[in-house]
């Protein structure tokens, strides 16, 4: 071991090893597939409590709600949602 060495393997040696690619050839696609399924099935919306894209606005709405008064914003949105 050279003076000042931390004893770790060089990065180039790691990424050129067969062991690295045997492990990562399975894990990287699996992580990608798991993320894709998590989002595409809608589980991400349920897990984090965010509304789904089709429930941001009511079906009768043609545009996004706009709050015109700073301090009455909540009451304006409540009134709009009751209609």
Swiss-Prot record:
It is found in: Cellular thylakoid membrane. Keywords: Electron transport, Heme, Iron, Membrane, Metal-binding, Photosynthesis, Photosystem II, Thylakoid, Transmembrane, Transmembrane helix, Transport. The keyword Heme applies. Signal peptide: none annotated. Heme binds at residue 24. With its partner (PsbF) binds heme. PSII binds additional chlorophylls, carotenoids and specific lipids. The keyword Aminoacyl-tRNA synthetase does not apply. GO terms for cellular component: photosystem II; plasma membrane-derived thylakoid membrane. The chain crosses the membrane at residues 22-36. It is a single-pass membrane protein. InterPro entries: PSII_cyt_b559_asu, PSII_cyt_b559_asu_sf, PSII_cyt_b559_N, PSII_cytb559_asu_lum. Pfam families: Cytochrom_B559, Cytochrom_B559a. Its cofactor is heme b. One of its GO terms (biological process) is photosynthetic electron transport chain. GO terms for molecular function: electron transfer activity; heme binding; iron ion binding. Heterodimer of an alpha subunit and a beta subunit. PSII is composed of 1 copy each of membrane proteins PsbA, PsbB, PsbC, PsbD, PsbE, PsbF, PsbH, PsbI, PsbJ, PsbK, PsbL, PsbM, PsbT, PsbX, PsbY, PsbZ, Psb30/Ycf12, peripheral proteins PsbO, CyanoQ (PsbQ), PsbU, PsbV and a large number of cofactors. It forms dimeric complexes. This b-type cytochrome is tightly associated with the reaction center of photosystem II (PSII). PSII is a light-driven water:plastoquinone oxidoreductase that uses light energy to abstract electrons from H(2)O, generating O(2) and a proton gradient subsequently used for ATP formation. It consists of a core antenna complex that captures photons, and an electron transfer chain that converts photonic excitation into a charge separation. Belongs to the PsbE/PsbF family. This is Cytochrome b559 subunit alpha. It comes from Synechococcus sp. (strain RCC307).
């Amino acid at each position: 071991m050279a003076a000042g060495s931390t004893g770790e393997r060089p990065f180039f040696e790691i990424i050129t090893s067969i062991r690295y690619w045997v492990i990562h050839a399975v894990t990287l696609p699996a992580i990608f597939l798991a993320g894709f399924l998590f989002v595409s099935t809608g589980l991400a919306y349920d897990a984090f409590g965010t509304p789904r894209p089709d429930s941001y606005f009511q079906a009768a709405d043609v545009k996004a709600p706009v709050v015109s008064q700073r301090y009455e914003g909540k009451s304006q949105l409540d009134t709009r949602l009751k209609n």
